[in-house]
Each structure stands twice: as structure tokens, then as C-alpha cells.
Amino acid sequence: MSTISRDSCPALRAGVRLQHDRARDQWVLLAPERVVELDDIALVVAQRYDGTQSLAQIAQTLAAEFDADASEIETDVIELTTTLHQKRLLRL
């Protein structure tokens, strides 16, 4: 499995999609035979997984958007991305 770094440019794997689940009234990552519920923060990050933006770029954008510390945001983004990658929901 690839190592996640600030230069990684993740995207959703084939067959995985970001979708609003009406039954749960929550955003989820929908993959074959599984559903991963996303909280508000995870949703904002997952919406930026397009395969072109690095995690550092995503963190910088979010830091500016939410007036937050970029290094803290980057740590959180890398942690979330690592978790989702380990669940085989992302490609790098």
C-alpha cells in the first residue's frame, strides 16, 4: 500500500462515490457492499479528492476557507486520507 504524504493527490477509487443518503440524512462514501458515513469535516475534505490536488493544497484551501491553522488542518487531512485509503476507498 502506498505511503500517504502531503504531496499525495488522492481520488475516489473506481466504484466509490460520494452520495447523500436520504435514509440516514447524511453524506456517505458508497462502495461495493459497504457504506462509510462522513461527518461534516470529512465531507469537506472528501469533496476535494479529485486526483489533481495534493493534500497540502487541500489543507491550504481549507485553512484559508475556515481561517484555521494550516499545519493542524494538514495533519487532520493526512490522517483522514490515511484511514480512507486503508479502507481501500481512495487511490493515490
Swiss-Prot record:
GO MF annotations, alphabetized: quinone binding
Transmembrane segments: none
Entry keywords, A to Z: PQQ biosynthesis
A GO biological process held by the record: pyrroloquinoline quinone biosynthetic process
Cysteine pairings via disulfide bonds: none
Pathway per the UniProt entry: Cofactor biosynthesis; pyrroloquinoline quinone biosynthesis
Lineage top rank: taxon: Bacteria
Pfam families: PqqD
Xref: InterPro entries: PQQD (IPR008792), PqqD_bac (IPR022479), PqqD_sf (IPR041881)
Classification via Gene3D superfamilies: Coenzyme PQQ synthesis protein D (PqqD) (1.10.10.1150)
Quaternary data: Monomer. Interacts with PqqE.
Protein function: Functions as a PqqA binding protein and presents PqqA to PqqE, in the pyrroloquinoline quinone (PQQ) biosynthetic pathway.
Family membership: Belongs to the PqqD family.
Stated name of the protein: PqqA binding protein
Lineage: Bacteria, Pseudomonadati, Pseudomonadota, Gammaproteobacteria, Lysobacterales
